[in-house]
Amino acid sequence: MMASTTSATAAGGAFAAAKTRAGSSAAGGGACARVAAGGRRRSGVVVRCDAGVEAQAQAQAVAKAASVAALEQFKISADRYMKERSSIAVIGLSVHTAPVEMREKLAVAEELWPRAISELTSLNHIEEAAVLSTCNRMEIYVVALSWNRGIREVVDWMSKKSGIPASELREHLFMLRDSDATRHLFEVSAGLDSLVLGEGQILAQVKQVVRSGQNSGGLGKNIDRMFKDAITAGKRVRCETNISSGAVSVSSAAVELALMKLPKSECLSARMLLIGAGKMGKLVVKHLIAKGCKKVVVVNRSVERVDAIREEMKDIEIVYRPLTEMYEAAAEADVVFTSTASETPLFTKEHAEALPAISDAMGGVRLFVDISVPRNVSACVSEVGHARVYNVDDLKEVVEANKEDRLRKAMEAQTIITQELKRFEAWRDSLETVPTIKKLRSYADRIRASELEKCLQKIGEDSLTKKMRRSIEELSTGIVNKLLHGPLQHLRCDGSDSRTLDETLENMHALNRMFSLDTEKAIIEQKIKAKVEKSQN
């Protein structure tokens, strides 16, 4: 995929539109269509950051109609194993492709990531897996032994978990494969695919995926390396482009939105309530301070986290209220920020109706700003006359500020992304020949051991001392190593010589043919067979 420049808003329902006009672009069977230089594709959508709004809309419409989405393509692909190595893929949805109502049904709490990874890697065609679930996205990264079968299994897993029919999910899911999947992760880590372009919290979330995956054992060598390289890319982009300067985060956008909805004359006197003292909640307090707020009430399950925030932030009065007093605290607040991991709503229409009215000076409306996924505040709360609800999908009007400057920096960031992508691809390409190297060594060693045994029998082992036997074994090993040195040198693909990847792969295939070595395709099929047998036991 060519260099991309900004996070694109993928159009829901792209699959249906693509079916009728995508025949020519789908030819060739590639999972991901190429896009024009300076563009970016997500579910068949390309956006250029150097184009105007009208040009962007036109580009989106053309790309959507001209591309068969990967999820549609995998359904019509030949249902057999065609690749010689496993495929890396990402499948998921984000704020760009799906509403919060759908994202919250698929959200996976951080403490459940290891369990999700274990379930995914137990699928017949999934070798490695990682889950990245935040308020703005739910993405599953996998190494699939068969990419079309593996993706089908992942979609079925997502459908079963969320209760959403697979056909409905496909209207909002995107899927990327191999280098496109890797580039996407690098862009996510760099903040280029965020609702808030350049925001920094996503990098910490990518780091947490690595820590969580290492504990569960699901991050095999491919995904582990890919995520670590994504962290490197994210750090480089922030250091070398300064893209985060002036950027807003979800928490700061939430504060900004609340202040936009309050009467200007009453912004600083509004009574602020925060429910949840986690990372996002802490950032809400930080940005309230930056806006001049002098007091905030914090409701949390335990007082320890609130004390830690109070100790760190001396410029604001923080009042702690236990969770049992949440509704009493809400009755005394003009603005309620919610940021908890609760999977059920904390506030329903009935709760909001029971709260007292707000003074006319504050606009007569209590504001609920919900930055949790799953949502902490039911959408029907807005049906109450003196209440309004805003969730993460409502932050878009805030993040437009300073966007043009960050888009220019995003273009600079693509150079770094491409450099890190090439490094990862070179590393992965170097693994291509590893199975052949192992099989060739094993083949040669079997012959060596067999011929050595014949030789020792002819000589008579009783007539040999231990030293003589060891010398003969070392001689046979040395001869094999010398003979293999040349062929194995021609299988190196680490950039240490002038050989291209194509030349190295030609050498690999030649050795496989000459020595009748098992192909990597056979190894993949053996892995699948082993997983199927294990699941049946």
Swiss-Prot record:
Origin superkingdom: Eukaryota
Recorded family membership: Belongs to the glutamyl-tRNA reductase family.
Group of enzyme by EC: oxidoreductase
Pathway: Porphyrin-containing compound metabolism; protoporphyrin-IX biosynthesis; 5-aminolevulinate from L-glutamyl-tRNA(Glu): step 1/2
Entry GO terms, CC: chloroplast
Transit peptide as recorded in UniProt: 1-48
Function recorded in the entry: Catalyzes the NADPH-dependent reduction of glutamyl-tRNA(Glu) to glutamate 1-semialdehyde (GSA).
Organism (species): Oryza sativa subsp. indica
Binding positions for substrate per the UniProt entry: T134, C135, N136, R137, S194, E199, G200, Q201, Q205
Remarks, miscellaneous: During catalysis, the active site Cys acts as a nucleophile attacking the alpha-carbonyl group of tRNA-bound glutamate with the formation of a thioester intermediate between enzyme and glutamate, and the concomitant release of tRNA(Glu). The thioester intermediate is finally reduced by direct hydride transfer from NADPH, to form the product GSA.
Name of the protein: Glutamyl-tRNA reductase, chloroplastic
